[in-house]
Regions:
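Negatively charged, low-complexity tracts enriched in Asp/Glu with abundant Ser/Thr
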Residues: 1-38, 62-70
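Intrinsically disordered, low-complexity regulatory segments enriched in Ser/Thr/Pro
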Residues: 39-75
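Generic detector of intrinsically disordered, low-complexity segments in short proteins
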Residues: 33, 87-88
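Weak global preference for isoleucine
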Residues: 9-11, 23, 31, 43, ...
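General N-terminal targeting signals
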Residues: 23, 48-50, 87
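Charge-rich, solvent-exposed alpha-helical interaction surfaces
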Residues: 9, 13, 17, 76-83, ...
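Alpha-helical interaction segments
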Residues: 19, 34-35, 51-53, 77-78
Length: 89
C-alpha cells in the first residue's frame, strides 16, 4: 500500500461491491458510494492526531448511509472497507 493515497486504497478495496467515486471539490472531499448511479452512502475521514517528528498520523474513517447517518467509525482503512462490504451484502 506504500505510495497509495487513502482514496485509491478505498476505491480499489470496494471494487465489485459498490462503485466508489472520489468527490474532490472546494470544501468537499470524500468517497461517494454508488449503486446504479445513485448515491447510497459515503466514506470520509479526518486526521485526529499527528506528530510529524515521529512520522505519526492517526486517521478516523466514517461510513454513512444515503441519509448521512453514521453506520461505522473505524481507525483503519481496511476495517472501514469491511464495514461497507458487510452493509452492502
Amino acid at each position: 500500500m506504500e505510495g497509495q493515497t487513502l482514496d485509491k486504497i478505498i476505491i480499489e478495496n470496494l471494487k465489485g461491491v459498490v462503485e466508489a467515486v472520489l468527490i474532490d471539490e472546494p470544501k468537499k472531499f470524500w468517497i461517494e458510494l454508488r449503486q446504479n448511479g445513485e448515491m447510497v452512502g459515503r466514506i470520509w475521514w479526518d486526521v485526529t492526531e499527528f506528530d510529524f517528528s515521529i512520522d505519526y498520523i492517526k486517521v478516523v474513517f466514517w461510513f454513512e448511509d444515503k441519509d448521512y447517518k453514521t453506520v461505522a467509525v473505524r481507525a483503519d482503512v481496511d476495517e472501514i472497507c469491511e464495514e461497507v462490504k458487510k452493509y452492502f451484502k
